[in-house]
Amino acid sequence: MTNGDVLAAVDKLKQFNQEFEFIHVVGESTLPLWLALSEAQKELSAIYHKPAFVLLEAVFPTEDSDGSGGIYDWAAQMETDRKKIANTDIQVCAAWGRIVRLDGRTQIANLAGLVSGRYAKAPVQESIGKTRPDAGYGFSGARLTELLPAGYNNSVIELLDVAGYLTFREYDGLSD
């Protein structure tokens, strides 16, 4: 799917007659799409009176063939990119994990899909970041077996979090 395809789909929401609150664009995306969707979201809200927030999935960090461009370079570039978006209704998920599907298969996936489910479950005034077990927003180790990629540690997570990305983290002492 191209950026143009995504923007054409969002453009159809101008005439969509049902209520909606958020748009989740599934699949890796980069700054050009984030910027275009930021403008489209502002137009939907201001002109068409359809406020919504947009959830996107960042590109999985990989090393270049020469071994350069590791996770810290990727995180620094992500921080730079986020500064170019002046829209609090655009959220980019920069977290991946190995998840166990309902049929028992494991898959490496961006965790925005899990977040979408938590948003649907949560009352509007409640944060999905609650960590109390009775809050019901955590993910069990049986469902989310590990955070990825390798090297996705607290320093990288903190950099991305401060920059405004949606991140996941594990807390020492907090178990299933």
Role assignments for model-derived ranges:
Residues 2-176:
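A glycine- and small-residue-enriched flexible loop/hinge signal that marks low-structured segments
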